[in-house]
C-alpha cells in the first residue's frame, strides 16, 4: 500500500482531522500520513476580509513547503485560514484552503455561514470569533471543536465537515490534472 505524506499548516485538531478525512476519502487505496505543524499566517489573528483570509491560507501552506526537506518526500502541503467579511447579504464567516502539490497550487473556499451583526461588531472591535462564541454560548475552546459553524447550525454542520468539503472541492485540479 502506497503512503501519502501530507503536512497541515496547523496544530488545530479540527484542521488536521479534516485533512485526514478528506484525503483518506479521495485516496482510499493509500495509507495516510498526515501531520500538523505550527505555521504562521502572516495576517491578523482574525482576518476581516476575503483577501486577507486567502492570503493567510497561502502563507501557511508556503511555510509548510519551505520547512520541508526533499528527503521528507511530502506529497501535499495544505493549510486553512478562517475569516469573516461583510458581504452584500451581511456578515459571514468562511475558510480558505490552500493546497501545494509539487509545483502546482489550488485554492478553494468553504461555504459562508451568516453571522449575527452583533458578533461581527465584536470581531470588528478586535476580538477573535472563537473567543466571542465561547463567551456567548458558554463553551470552552470551541474553535478546536465544532466552531461557530457547529454552534449556529446546532451541529448539523461543523468546522470539520465544512473544511473537509472545501478541501475535497479544491483537490479537483489534482484529481483531474488533464482537465486543468
Residue ranges and their predicted role:
Residues 45-180:
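Anionic-ligand binding patches
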Residues 2-74:
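N-terminal polybasic phosphate/anion-binding patch
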Amino acid at each position: 500500500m502506497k503512503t501519502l505524506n501530507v503536512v497541515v499548516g496547523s496544530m488545530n485538531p479540527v484542521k488536521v482531522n479534516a485533512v485526514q478525512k478528506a484525503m483518506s476519502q479521495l485516496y482510499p487505496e493509500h495509507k495516510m500520513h498526515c501531520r500538523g505543524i505550527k505555521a504562521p499566517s502572516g495576517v491578523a489573528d482574525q482576518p476581516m476580509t476575503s483577501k486577507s483570509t486567502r492570503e493567510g491560507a497561502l502563507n501557511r501552506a508556503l511555510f509548510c513547503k519551505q520547512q520541508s526537506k526533499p528527503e521528507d518526500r511530502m506529497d501535499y502541503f495544505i493549510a486553512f485560514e478562517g475569516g469573516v467579511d461583510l458581504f452584500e447579504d451581511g456578515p459571514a464567516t468562511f475558510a480558505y484552503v490552500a493546497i501545494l502539490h509539487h509545483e502546482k497550487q489550488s485554492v478553494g473556499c468553504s461555504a459562508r455561514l451568516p453571522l449575527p451583526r452583533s458578533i461581527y461588531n465584536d470581531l470588528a472591535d478586535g476580538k477573535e470569533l472563537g473567543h466571542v462564541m465561547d463567551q456567548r454560548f458558554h463553551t470552552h475552546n470551541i474553535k478546536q471543536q465544532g466552531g461557530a459553524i457547529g454552534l449556529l447550525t446546532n451541529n448539523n454542520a461543523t468546522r470539520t465537515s465544512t473544511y473537509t468539503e472545501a478541501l475535497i472541492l479544491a483537490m479537483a485540479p489534482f484529481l483531474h490534472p488533464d482537465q486543468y
